[in-house]
C-alpha cells in the first residue's frame, strides 16, 4: 500500500477523518474509472489498440446543485484547467471537479457538460 504523508511523519494541522480520505468530508462524492487496454511493447505504435487512462469525478456537495467557493493556482502553467475564468471571475465552482490526463481534457469536458445538462445540474 502506498504511504501517505502522515505515514512519513510529514506534519499537518487538524485531525484525520476515519478513512483519511476526501470522502470523509460530509457530502463529498467521488467516482472514477480506469481504462487499461492492450499490452505495451517495444513495437507499440500509434496504430495499436493500447490505452492507459482514466478520469476521477469529485462532487463537492454530492448531488446538491449549489455552488462552492473556489480558488485555483497554476503550479507551472502546464496542463489544462477548463473553467478557470469562471472561478477567477466569480470565486465559485458549480458542478463536478474532473481529473484526467491532458489529452483527455476535451472529451471529459464534453461528457461532463452532457451529464450536467441531462441531470439538470
Sequence positions of predicted segments:
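Alpha/propeptide regions of enzymes that mature by internal proteolysis
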Residues: 1-121
Amino acid at each position: 500500500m502506498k504511504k501517505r504523508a502522515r505515514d512519513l511523519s510529514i506534519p499537518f494541522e487538524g485531525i484525520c477523518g476515519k478513512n483519511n480520505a476526501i470522502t470523509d468530508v460530509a457530502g463529498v462524492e467521488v467516482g472514477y474509472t480506469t481504462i487499461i487496454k492492450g499490452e505495451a511493447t517495444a513495437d507499440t505504435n500509434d496504430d495499436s489498440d493500447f490505452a492507459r487512462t482514466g478520469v476521477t469525478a469529485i462532487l463537492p456537495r454530492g448531488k446538491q446543485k449549489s455552488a462552492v467557493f473556489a480558488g485555483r493556482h497554476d503550479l507551472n502553467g502546464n496542463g489544462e484547467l477548463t473553467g478557470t475564468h469562471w472561478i477567477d471571475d466569480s470565486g465559485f465552482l458549480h458542478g463536478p471537479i474532473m481529473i484526467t490526463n491532458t489529452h483527455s481534457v476535451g472529451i471529459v469536458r464534453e461528457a461532463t457538460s452532457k451529464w450536467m445538462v441531462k441531470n439538470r445540474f
